[in-house]
Every structure is written in structure tokens, then in C-alpha cells.
From Swiss-Prot:
<feature type="binding site">
    <location>
        <position position="92"/>
    </location>
    <ligand>
        <name>substrate</name>
    </ligand>
</feature>
<dbReference type="GO" id="GO:0003676">
    <property type="term" value="F:nucleic acid binding"/>
</dbReference>
<feature type="binding site">
    <location>
        <begin position="45"/>
        <end position="51"/>
    </location>
    <ligand>
        <name>substrate</name>
    </ligand>
</feature>
<feature type="glycosylation site" description="N-linked (GlcNAc...) asparagine">
    <location>
        <position position="138"/>
    </location>
</feature>
<dbReference type="InterPro" id="IPR003154">
    <property type="entry name" value="S1/P1nuclease"/>
</dbReference>
<feature type="binding site">
    <location>
        <position position="15"/>
    </location>
    <ligand>
        <name>a divalent metal cation 2</name>
    </ligand>
</feature>
<dbReference type="Pfam" id="PF02265">
    <property type="entry name" value="S1-P1_nuclease"/>
</dbReference>
<dbReference type="GO" id="GO:0008254">
    <property type="term" value="F:3'-nucleotidase activity"/>
</dbReference>
<keyword id="KW-0540">Nuclease</keyword>
<keyword id="KW-0479">Metal-binding</keyword>
<feature type="binding site">
    <location>
        <begin position="73"/>
        <end position="78"/>
    </location>
    <ligand>
        <name>substrate</name>
    </ligand>
</feature>
<dbReference type="InterPro" id="IPR008947">
    <property type="entry name" value="PLipase_C/P1_nuclease_dom_sf"/>
</dbReference>
<keyword id="KW-0325">Glycoprotein</keyword>
<feature type="binding site">
    <location>
        <position position="116"/>
    </location>
    <ligand>
        <name>a divalent metal cation 1</name>
    </ligand>
</feature>
<keyword id="KW-1015">Disulfide bond</keyword>
<feature type="glycosylation site" description="N-linked (GlcNAc...) asparagine">
    <location>
        <position position="184"/>
    </location>
</feature>
<feature type="disulfide bond">
    <location>
        <begin position="72"/>
        <end position="217"/>
    </location>
</feature>
Length: 270
């Protein structure tokens, strides 16, 4: 996701993080701000663009070597790659965020990475190798020539919300939380975190990746990439996918909160 999506995931998470876990996370991040997660949600994207952080680029995705739209699947052993991927990163930083042998800066970095990568995993094209996760599928959206990946990351969410400031993300998150509390998502939400376990991070994160990857076949490109390259994706394609984008952002926030709560719970138990 782009800045709007990541901040919205973080604001949804902030709603569901327990007060005790919130204090713990604020202590790690050195922030008592009301946007303590949202304000750092895109740090990992900024970091990977620096010379010091370019090593981390592969951690933002897993390249599922499948065959959409005919076949979508994630295989951790097949797809993760020697330089790591989102799944291995979530496992690594889940361990590092509370490793007492590491520095407070290591802990803060780990939490910043977790906030970002758990969000990225719900963007279907971050769980897909085809055309570099859709980056090489050139399309037109609302009159602009861009690529399918950036439309999913940034331009379609911004079209829905109308901006990308923290205040826009906070407003969107409130709507998504309402849907979780008493709306379209209420019956689904417990299923989003079913079986999630910080002691089994590879298994858990692979399930998250598989959940989003399946949408590449059913929602993102159900008729293949070529079908998206004629005409403008707005409004017909946009209308067909925007509900899924909202659902995936909500899932990311709900899962992130549960993950933080579980990590904090294991800290207390030590």
C-alpha cells in the first residue's frame, strides 16, 4: 500500500490494540502521540529508498510463482527467495521486537517493520510474482498512464478517500472500524485472525499471504492482465475492486492489532 493505506491499517490497529499493549508499543517507539503507529507506518518504504536501507526491498513482498488467473497459490519454500520476503521478515521482527539482548533502537526498528509488512501482506499484488507484482502491467486509471500495482497501492485508495494525509487515513479507519463493529465485516472479523499465533509466525504469515494472493485470481485480474490494458480502469474496474481494497485494509489493521497484543502478552508471561 501507499501512505494512505498504511496509515489507515495502523489507525484501525490502534483501535484494537489493548491499552497495556499500546503503552508498551508507545514506549518502544518513544511516542505518546495519538497516531503512534500511523505516523511510522510508511517508515519502511522511506528506509528502503535510502542507500542504508536498500537491502530491505525484498522484505515488502513474497513473489508467488503461480499462474494467475488460472492458478493462485503461495509456497513459502518455493517463493521466499534467498534475500528474504515479507513472511520471513514478519517472523524475524516478531522475534527481534522483544529480544532482550537487542537495543531499544533494534526494538523500535522491528516494530516499525512489523507495522508496515503486516499491512503490505493484505495488498494482493504484494503476494504475486507475475509481471513483478503487477508493476509491469501498464494501464490507464482515471486518465493517467501508470501500472496496476501502483493503482492498487495508491491511486484507487486515494480516489475513494480523496487525499492521503494522516487525517484522511484516520477518517477512513473510523469507517472501517464501524464496519467491523456493526457492519459488513462483523461476521468475518474473527476469521481474519483465526489461528494466528506469534509462536508460529511463518505458518501465520503464509496464511495471510495465501488469503490475499487468492484475490489476484478472483478480483485483481480474473480475466488476465491483457483485459486490463484496453480502456480506462475507471470507473468499471475500480467499482469491481474497491470493496476488496477496503476489506483488505481492514483485515491488515485487525491482524496487526492482534499481533501486537499477542507479542505484548508473551512479554508479560516471561
Amino acid at each position: 500500500w501507499g501512505a494512505l493505506g498504511h496509515a489507515t491499517v495502523a489507525y484501525v490497529a490502534q483501535h484494537y490494540v489493548s491499552p497495556e499493549a499500546a503503552s508498551w508499543a508507545q514506549g518502544i517507539l518513544g511516542s505518546s502521540s495519538s497516531s503512534y503507529l500511523a505516523s511510522i507506518a510508511s517508515w519502511a518504504d522511506e528506509y528502503r529508498l535510502t542507500s542504508a536501507g536498500k537491502w530491505s526491498a525484498s522484505l515488502h513482498f513474497i513473489d508467488a510463482e503461480d499462474n494467475p488467473p488460472t492458478n493462485c497459490n503461495v509456497d513459502y519454500e518455493r517463493d521466499c527467495g534467498s534475500s528474504g520476503c515479507s513472511i520471513s521478515a514478519i517472523a524475524n521482527y516478531t522475534q527481534r521486537v522483544s529480544d532482550s539482548s537487542l537495543s531499544s533502537e533494534n526494538h523500535a526498528e522491528a516494530l516499525r517493520f512489523l507495522v508496515h509488512f503486516i499491512g503490505d501482506m493484505t495488498q494482493p499484488l504484494h503476494d504475486e510474482a507475475y509481471a513483478v507484482g503487477g508493476n509491469k502491467i501498464n494501464v490507464t486509471f482515471d486518465g493517467y498512464h501508470d501500472n496496476l500495482h501502483s493503482d492498487w497501492d495508491t491511486y484507487m485508495p486515494q480516489k475513494l478517500i480523496g487525499g492521503h494525509a494522516l487525517s484522511d487515513a484516520e477518517s477512513w479507519a473510523k469507517t472501517l472500524v464501524q464496519n467491523i463493529e456493526s457492519g459488513n465485516y462483523t461476521a468475518q472479523a474473527t476469521g481474519w485472525i483465526k489461528g494466528d499465533n506469534i509462536s508460529e509466525p511463518i505458518t501465520t504469515a503464509t496464511r495471510w499471504a495465501s488469503d490475499a494472493n487468492a484475490l489476484v485470481c478472483t478480483v485483481v485480474m480474473p480475466h488476465g492482465a491483457a483485459a486490463l490494458q484496453t480502456g480506462d480502469l475507471y470507473p468499471t474496474y475500480y467499482d469491481s475492486v474497491i470493496d476488496t481494497i477496503e476489506l483488505q485494509i481492514a483485515k491488515g489493521g485487525y491482524r496487526l492489532a492482534n499481533w501486537i497484543n499477542e507479542i505484548h502478552g508473551s512479554e508479560i508471561a516471561k
